[in-house]
């Protein structure tokens, strides 16, 4: 190899090193997804979202109307619209569904039979709603740290999720504020579903 070619090769390698070290540019922006978070009052929606945002638990106040939180993850930002779960609020939930790309449904796995039945009815309505039925769902069986908590298998059977959600993208996960790692993993799985739906839309 001639001296000229050797010099050119070294110059090109120097250029590549320079590009790698000095010209990286800003990191690519994380994708953002707009989600709606629903569930009965007392299910723990606000506390779970506040934990993910590293907010002090002392400042947590139950949501009466709606609130929006930007929940950051390494590979995405979730803009979560949390809706209050009181009786007089739930009838207005559907007004806030438009534009959602995914759904988080939080239930109290240690609740009374009456409340659990109400939660089941609300989840069934959400799964079948025209604006939500094609979206990924993350269903969180919260308060697993309580003695009366029902298992994920019990929740799945009682809520009739297998037949009702067949063909849909959904995840049912246990959670509690005592196990933040499992909570974060649940949201990571939801992000994977959101990304899959994005990729399918691009291919179409």
UniProtKB/Swiss-Prot annotation:
Keywords: GTP-binding, Nucleotide-binding. It comes from the Eukaryota. The keyword DNA-binding does not apply. Belongs to the small GTPase superfamily. Arf family. Pfam families: Arf. Gene3D superfamilies: P-loop containing nucleotide triphosphate hydrolases (3.40.50.300). This is ADP-ribosylation factor-like protein 15. GTP binds at residues 39-46, 82-86, 142-145. GO terms for molecular function: GTP binding; GTPase activity.
């Amino acid at each position: 190899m001639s001296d000229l070619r050797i010099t050119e090769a070294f110059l090109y390698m120097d250029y590549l090193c320079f590009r790698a070290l000095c010209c990286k540019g800003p990191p690519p922006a994380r994708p953002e997804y707009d989600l709606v978070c629903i569930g009965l009052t007392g299910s723990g929606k606000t506390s779970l979202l506040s934990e993910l945002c590293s907010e002090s638990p002392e400042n947590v106040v139950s949501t009466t109307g709606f609130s929006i939180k930007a929940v950051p993850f390494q590979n995405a930002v979730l803009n979560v619209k949390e809706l209050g779960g009181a009786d007089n609020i739930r009838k207005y939930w559907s007004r806030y569904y438009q534009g959602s790309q995914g759904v988080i449904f939080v239930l109290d796995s240690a609740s009374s039979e009456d409340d659990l039945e109400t939660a089941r009815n609300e989840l069934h309505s959400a799964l079948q709603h025209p604006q939500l039925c094609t979206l990924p769902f993350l269903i969180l069986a919260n308060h697993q740290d309580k003695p009366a908590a029902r298992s994920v298998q019990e929740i799945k059977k009682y809520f009739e999720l297998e037949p009702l959600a067949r063909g849909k993208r959904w995840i049912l996960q246990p959670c509690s504020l005592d196990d933040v790692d499992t909570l974060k993993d649940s949201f990571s799985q939801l992000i994977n579903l959101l990304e899959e739906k994005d990729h399918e839309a691009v291919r179409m």
